[in-house]
Amino acid sequence: MHSFKKTKKKKGLLGIKIDFQKAYDRMEWKFLFLNLKAFGFSNKFTNLINQCLSTMQYSVLLNGGKCPSFKGLRQGDPLSPYLFILGSEVLMRLISREVDRGQLIAIKVSSNVPTISKLCYADDVILFSKAKMSELSSLKICLERYCPWSGQKVNVEKSGIFPSKGLSQQFLNKIKSC
C-alpha cells in the first residue's frame, strides 16, 4: 500500500482491504467441511475437526444474566486461523480464476517481484486490481458468490480502498458507491 501512494510510476491501481464482519463466528461449518474434503483431507481428519468444533459452546454472562450460547471458530484457538484460511481459499481461487480468464489483471507493486491479485492472512484480505470498473465488477462478483457459501458478510464501514496516485476523486466516489 505504501508504494501505491509514494511511487510516481504506479498509476491506476487499487488495493482493497476487505473486512469480514465477525469473520470467525460467521464461517459456515458445512462450507468448511466441504472444503476440507475437496482439498483432500481424509474423512478421519474432517471428523476430528468436526468433533473439536461441535463439542464447544460458549455462553456469556452480561449484567448478571446469561446470554444464549453460541458456536463458531474461536478467536484465540490456534486451529481457527488455519480453518478460516482454508475457507478463504475458495475466494482466493475464484479470484485466481478471474485472473486466468483475463477479467482481472494481477499487478506488480514493485520491480523484481511477482504479480499479485490478492493477499490473505487469517481474517484479513487485501485485493489488488487495475482501477477499471470491469475489474471491480469481477471482484464484486467473486465476493457475491463467496459470501453466501461461506456465511461471510463484508463490513463496509471497516473495509477500505487504497488508490495509487493519479485517480480522480470522481472515480473514487464512483467506486465507493458500489
Regions found by a protein language model. Name each.
Residues 1-178:
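Nucleotidyl polymerases of mobile genetic elements and RNA viruses
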